[in-house]
Amino acid sequence: MSKVNKVVLAYSGGLDTSVIVKWLQENYDCEVVTFTADIGQGEEVEPARAKAEKLGVKQIFIEDLREEFARDFVFPMFRANTIYEGEYLLGTSIARPLIAKRLVEIANETGADAISHGATGKGNDQVRFELGAYALKPGIKVIAPWREWDLTSREKLLTYCDTHDIAVEKKKGKSPYSMDANLLHISYEGGILEDPWEEAEEDMWRWSVSPEAAPDQATYLELTYQNGDIVAIDGEALAPHEVIERLNKVGGVNGVGRLDIVENRYVGMKSRGCYETPGGTIMLRAHRAIESITLDKELAHLKDSLMPKYAELIYNGYWWSPERLALQKLIDESQQHVNGVVRVKLYKGNVIVAGRKSEDSLFDDRIATFEDDGGVYNQRDAEGFIKLNALRMRIAADKGRSMK
């Protein structure tokens, strides 16, 4: 092991990262700085301070990053209507670049020469943390204990705690799955969910009721957009993180946002994940609705063609890459006229667009009407349009080429 003087650890206060603190002190003979972020996971983060102090940590950073997370990461992603493999709203993926950024910034502030995280060697998070760190600080050293130690089970971790007098909560029995939450979503993986044929039990879901148990009366919301971002709900101005919190609550009550998928991880394996993203599900549907009347056709189609690549970059950990940054500039430029109001109806797991309006709308009812348009649209123009677009196919047919 190369010499490390000080390391900044992404610290949750849970079993894994508490063990990592002591393991780093013991195996690297270094000072450990802990960083705990509130990104809307719904748990108190302040108790992590006392836990870190008991482990001998002198420099402890606990920060509320909910607003930065929503404003600078979630909202920019939703301007692109981003989904991975047609379904996943990237709730875990989009949180990692912010944590990587703060790890590097704290390393700079404290003079640390390394960072560390609790991601395993099988998952995507190790890639996301480390790609971000190297992009922002090329010379930083990264310590990933799960790729080094032999503590390969919960039982071994608990034994290590007993041996090293680490106080952790010891829950009886094995957890049926692992959970990870932030402002945008909560995920469930592993354990009983590793069989893709087995339906997730109803009591697993934390943020939403089942569609069957949702109210029989629909809920209507009016979402106000400015430059592609929601700035108000039902006329009430809200900060980005407040928008997500409000939509999570009302969406969950109406059974919105559940997802059960098998996704392709960047590291090569297929993995089943169950997710609850009530607010994000509403945001995606509503954003597409406001774009439908404010975006030029070819610009909208260009965005749609680029979205899968943009989603893949985020999923794989390339948030800080030049290609993602370049795509973001195009996406943000496309949003300058995405202003207006979308009305949505939430009903038993469904998000139904019930109206959209904008002063920047490109929808012209004089042209679109099926009634007499007063000569605004000359239908005879369509003949030349059709003939020109058919020209290449007519030439091929004249040459005897089969179109079957």
Curated annotation (Swiss-Prot):
Alphabetical UniProt keywords: Amino-acid biosynthesis, Arginine biosynthesis, ATP-binding, Cytoplasm, Ligase, Nucleotide-binding
Kindly report, in one word, the top-level EC class recorded for this enzyme. Answer: ligase
Q: Which InterPro entries match?
A: Arginosuc_syn_C, Arginosuc_syn_N, Arginosuc_synth, Arginosuc_synth_CS, Arginosuc_synth_type_1_subfam, AS_cat/multimer_dom_body, Rossmann-like_a/b/a_fold
Q: Which Pfam families match?
A: Arginosuc_syn_C (PF20979), Arginosuc_synth (PF00764)
Reactions mediated catalytically: L-citrulline + L-aspartate + ATP = 2-(N(omega)-L-arginino)succinate + AMP + diphosphate + H(+)
Matches recorded under SUPFAM superfamilies: Adenine nucleotide alpha hydrolases-like, Argininosuccinate synthetase, C-terminal domain
Positions binding L-citrulline in this chain are Y88, S93, N124, R128, S178, S187, E263, Y275
Give the EC number(s) under which this enzyme is classified: 6.3.4.5
Its subcellular locations are: Cytoplasm
What does the subunit section of this Swiss-Prot or TrEMBL entry state? Homotetramer.
Protein name (record): Argininosuccinate synthase
What taxonomic ancestry is recorded? Bacteria, Pseudomonadati, Pseudomonadota, Gammaproteobacteria, Oceanospirillales
- Gene name on record? argG
